[in-house]
Amino acid sequence: MAEKIYTIPINEAFDKTLESETPDCPLCLLRRMLEKNEIERITGAAMMEPDVRIETNKKGFCRRHFDMMTGGGGSRLPIALMLESHIAETEKEIFSGGTLFDGKGAKEEEKLARLEASCYVCSRVDDAFSKMLGTVIYLWENEEQFREKYEAQRCFCLPDYKLLLAAGRDNLPKKMFGEFFSVSRDIMKKYIHELGGDVSWFCKKFDYRYDSEPWYNAKDSVPRAINFLSGGVNSEENK
């Protein structure tokens, strides 16, 4: 089957994890790619597009994506321009009108809760990532070569494993989902067992009785375990 433009990043991520010395969740690689692309987009020319500014003014950004925007070493002017209009929008929406006794602050609390839960980058990434999950399931169902690539994966993080199962259950025929679940679960069972052993060995290495023993795969087991439990890219830990 000829490769489509929307399958290219998925195949590249699943290839990269097989080539990497460090086990990684391919879906975490895809999410990180989407985040970086979106950050580059909104701190570039898209920042001045009216429809983009309307959304960034309204939604703002979460702390993680603020940190990604300011941590790239580029000019902070695009960020400042977005902040200028976002702060003005926030002031107008939350602090204009009403009195101190208007619901005893309940309305402001509701608005603040909505703002806190919103992020322009998160909403864009989540939408694109949801489509990518659907494509992963489509490739599993229709392409034998991708199915082999999937079965060769070393791990998925727990949050993405949950999403994979939900997407598979919603989109695959019942019999095929059973196979998908079995393969995915085998990958996870093998990795969590190995990871648990690596973390245990890391702990043992702080016992003087194990001083002369090699580290094996335990040196990076703590960040790997955190990324497995919460999501993250292992191969970027030391960059």
Regions found by a protein language model. Name each.
Residues 1-239:
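Intrinsically disordered, low-complexity regulatory regions of eukaryotic proteins
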